[in-house]
Design a protein with these regions (language model features):
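Accessory helical-bundle/CTD segments and flexible terminal tails appended to RecA-like ATPase motors
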Residues: 1-94
Length: 94
């Protein structure tokens, strides 16, 4: 089976604000590691690390983590795209 990418495009704020992590190098590292989430354990570990290092994450950071977890689960289910348009969410299968 060919390898494929899964993309997620939802109408939610999902980012790390400067008020949460101001150091750009740390922020870039965290973005890369969040993008690498593949399992529930990865998600739990990342959330725990964020809490320990930077305090309580806001809604945008929690959304970012949830989207990374959703993307990993969707990929395992051979979903290539999750796209929200208005109130409709479309799932495209491989």
């Amino acid at each position: 089976m060919e390898d494929f990418e899964t993309s997620v495009d939802l109408n939610v704020d999902a980012y790390i604000p400067d008020s949460y992590i101001s150091n750009e190098f740390q922020k870039l590292d965290i973005y890369k590691r969040i993008a690498g989430i593949e399992t529930q354990q990865d998600y739990d570990d990342m959330l725990e690390e964020l809490l320990d290092r930077f305090g309580e994450p806001g809604k945008a950071v929690l959304n970012l983590l949830a989207i990374a977890k959703l993307k990993a689960i969707a990929h395992q289910g051979y979903v290539t795209e999750i796209k929200q348009t208005g109130k409709t969410v479309r799932f495209t299968l491989y």
